[in-house]
């Protein structure tokens, strides 16, 4: 069965356009709720429960109410947290012993977009099979349960305090952040009211940007996808480093004191190196098809195993669980540290990097300067139709020519975006000029076919 609604990271789109509408969200809440009720075999649980959180988009109020109505109509109790980071909902789902967690967010996208992400009772992103079951259930009519079986809704007023305490618990009590000046960029998003408290309570001097959400400014010229803002602030304030989150708090990039952007790949390497040095690394590291070749080489030089999986933190998680490893991530800043949390958490990942720097006795610059990334050029080609990239002779002929020129000192990756109507062309290698030319040639070949 072909997916109609779910992409690589939940459901996402423009508010007011299918499927990001109130009526669809009522149906979605009822569909998921009906599955939870059907799967509830614990007689002690009269009503399954879900935790619903959201980021700071103005549309979150409308969509939250619609989801809430759908779940209650299905006989499911609802816990409402208000604006909270995506990984906070994963944590609270476990802490409140709920059967699922729902986040209303479009992550790093601009405010007109919104969507949903779903977590299991274990605080993990749900497998493809569950999403397919939801897709099927969406085709069924809503049949509200009998009045005495309706669910109830409750606000969790101390959700921020619970999450702050949890995040701080992942940082060793023997360490602190005293003496560090840190610039935080909360992207006017879901971390705005929790992240500054966490880092300051651990001892850091914190300068905060992007902490004044108004419903419309999430990710607007701030956050992990706009690192120039925090780069300028880090240099201006002569800070030791900068930390930028995305709108829902599951991605992070950092800035060293000289203004260099440190992406998710490099941050994973820092964490893995410190764990290896302290004999605490479980197995190896999981990256994705987008992970820079320089990181793979650096891990190999440290005798740390490395495997690639599909793009998307859910696939990184699946591979980590299969192998029994604990560290993985994406260059975009999704970083999983399974010894601390069941999903990618930007705040916790940042704390693990800071812990690693303390253990290595290095600055962020010192910890990353010896592993410069290979030049990587990414071109997004907009498309309105699906293309069989693997079997398109014109495109594949160009790729073969490029790969022969790169030899074993570079690579090509061509894939459709899981969240946008685009085809992503990525080329990386040691020589920037050669890499840029190669990416442009492949992009032209793709454009000719769309």
Which residue stretches match the model-derived regions?
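Gly/Ser/Thr-enriched, mixed-charge loops and adjacent short helices
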Residues: 1, 114-235
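An N-terminal, well-structured beta->alpha segment
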Residues: 1-69, 73-74, 153-180, 387-388
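N-terminal small/polar loop signature for handling phosphorylated ligands or for N-terminal nucleophile
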Residues: 34-38, 42, 49-113, 197-255
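Short glycine-rich phosphate-binding loop at a beta-alpha junction
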Residues: 44-55, 181-183, 283-289, 424-426
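Active-site nucleophile and cofactor-binding loops and adjacent substrate-binding regions
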Residues: 78-87, 261-264, 288, 309-310
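Phosphate-binding and adjacent anionic-ligand microenvironments
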Residues: 241, 277-450
């Amino acid at each position: 069965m072909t997916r109609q609604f779910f992409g690589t990271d939940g459901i996402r789109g423009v508010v007011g356009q299918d499927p990001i509408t109130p009526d669809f969200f009522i149906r979605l809440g009822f569909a998921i709720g009906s599955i939870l009720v059907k799967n509830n075999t614990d007689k002690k649980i009269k009503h399954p429960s879900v935790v619903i959180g959201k980021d700071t988009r103005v549309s979150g109020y409308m969509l939250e109410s619609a989801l809430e109505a759908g779940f209650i109509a299905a006989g499911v109790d609802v816990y409402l947290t208000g604006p909270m980071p995506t990984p906070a909902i994963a944590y609270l789902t476990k802490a409140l012993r709920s059967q699922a967690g729902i986040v209303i967010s479009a992550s790093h996208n601009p405010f007109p977009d919104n969507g949903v992400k779903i977590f299991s009772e274990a605080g993990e992103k749900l497998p493809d099979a569950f999403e397919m079951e939801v897709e099927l259930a969406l085709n069924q009519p809503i049949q509200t349960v009998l009045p005495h079986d309706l669910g109830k809704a409750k606000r969790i007023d101390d959700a921020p305090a619970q999450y702050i305490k949890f995040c701080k618990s992942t940082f060793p009590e023997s360490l602190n952040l005293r003496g560090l000046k840190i610039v935080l960029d909360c992207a006017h998003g879901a971390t705005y009211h929790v992240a500054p408290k966490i880092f300051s309570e651990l001892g850091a001097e914190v300068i905060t940007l992007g902490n004044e959400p108004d419903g419309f400014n999430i990710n607007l010229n701030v956050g992990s996808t706009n690192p120039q803002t925090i780069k300028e602030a880090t240099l201006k304030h002569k800070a030791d480093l900068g930390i930028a989150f995305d709108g829902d708090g599951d991605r992070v990039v950092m800035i060293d004191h000289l203004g260099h952007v440190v992406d998710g790949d490099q941050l994973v390497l820092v964490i893995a190196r410190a764990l290896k040095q302290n004999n605490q690394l479980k197995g190896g590291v999981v990256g994705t098809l987008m992970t820079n070749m320089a990181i793979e080489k650096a891990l190999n030089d440290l005798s740390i195993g490395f495997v690639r999986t599909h793009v998307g933190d859910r696939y990184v998680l699946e591979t980590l669980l299969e192998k029994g490893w604990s560290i993985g991530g994406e260059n975009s800043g999704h970083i999983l540290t399974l010894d601390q949390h069941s999903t990618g958490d930007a705040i916790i990942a940042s704390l693990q990097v800071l812990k690693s720097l303390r253990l290595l006795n290095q600055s962020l610059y010192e910890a990353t300067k010896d592993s410069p990334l290979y030049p990587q050029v990414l071109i997004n080609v907009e498309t309105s139709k699906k293309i069989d990239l693997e079997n398109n002779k014109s495109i594949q002929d160009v790729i073969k020519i490029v790969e022969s020129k790169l030899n074993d000192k570079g690579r090509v990756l061509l894939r459709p975006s899981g969240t946008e109507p685009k085809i992503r062309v990525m080329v990386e290698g040691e020589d920037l000029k050669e890499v840029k030319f190669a990416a442009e040639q492949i992009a032209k070949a793709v454009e000719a076919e769309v």
